[in-house]
A protein has these predicted regions:
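Bacterial Sec-dependent N-terminal signal peptides
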Residues: 1-28
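Solvent-exposed, charged interface segments at domain starts and junctions
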Residues: 4-7, 26, 37-46, 114-126, ...
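Alpha-helical interaction segments
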Residues: 4-7, 36-37, 43, 68, ...
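Generic surface-pattern signal
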Residues: 6, 51, 55-59, 187, ...
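A generic structural signal for short, non-catalytic loop/turn and secondary-structure boundary residues
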Residues: 16-18, 62-63, 68, 187
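Serine-esterase "nucleophile elbow" of acetyl-processing enzymes
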Residues: 25-115
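Alpha-helical cap/lid subdomain in secreted, periplasmic
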Residues: 83-86, 105-238
């Protein structure tokens, strides 16, 4: 019996000082409760921003029968858009430096679920900066337009023209061509409008008005957004 107890004691001692046991002793108990990483690597561009929109929506339900602003950073940075259109329920889903491909990719996340009464689109600026042609930008707009029509029916769709800016002045010929193609497409359709802010942002010499922009000469200041507010107001649904 004594021999059996001695053997058992040796086994216990060996286990106590084994690497596995030492590791368990040194590892905090909270390690097992560490949160699981839910964001997988290699997600498409702006995935985190879209996830943040969804998180906010889960906390506070967006207004029903709203006007949805969707597109790139010119909308994202329009943080006072609701104040600029009092009495109009606005959902602003501008994100990143998005292109038409990005908006198309996330349409199921940031357009369809809201069932808006009107969609206002600003996009194409970054597409041209990335080297896409005016015709390519036009085709991507048409794809997005057709997607919205198919899913949301005859709601009003408003396209805000691609804006000129000092930092992208060399792209102005492509901007004008893309704007013209989209304008002509919209002119042949009902429940669709083209808002020309492009020419409102040029000086008499045909250059972008410098004092409408912040230091990066790409994004707008309050003066720039005031022009947009005045141009857009007649096209918004009450």
């Amino acid at each position: 019996m004594k021999k059996t107890l001695t053997t058992f004691a040796l086994i216990v001692l060996c286990w106590a000082f084994s690497p596995t046991a030492l590791l368990r002793a040194q590892t905090p108990a909270t390690t097992a409760a560490a949160p699981v990483q839910t964001i997988a690597p290699n997600q498409p561009p702006f995935w985190n921003e879209i996830a943040e929109f969804k998180r906010r929506d889960s906390i506070q339900r967006p207004p029903a029968n709203a006007i949805l602003f969707v597109g790139s950073s010119s909308f994202r940075k329009w943080t006072g858009v609701q104040n600029d259109f009092p009495g109009y329920p606005i959902i602003n889903r501008g994100f990143g430096g998005s292109t038409f491909d990005d908006v198309i990719r996330y349409a199921g996340d940031i357009i369809y679920p809201y069932h808006p009464k009107e969609v206002v689109i600003y996009c194409g600026d970054n597409d041209l900066a990335a080297g896409r042609s005016a015709k390519k930008v036009y085709k991507r707009f048409v794809k997005l337009y057709d997607m919205i029509r198919k899913r949301l029916g005859n709601i009003d769709i408003v396209f805000v023209s691609i804006k000129p800016s000092p930092s992208r002045e060399k792209l102005m010929p492509e901007m004008e061509q893309a704007n013209d193609l989209i304008r002509n497409f919209i002119a042949e359709r009902s429940h669709a409008s083209f808002v020309d802010v492009y020419h409102l942002m040029l000086n008499p010499q045909g250059h972008p008005i410098d004092n409408l922009f912040v230091a990066d000469k790409l994004h707008m200041n309050e003066k720039g957004y005031k022009i947009w507010q005045q141009a857009l107001l007649p096209y918004l649904d009450k």
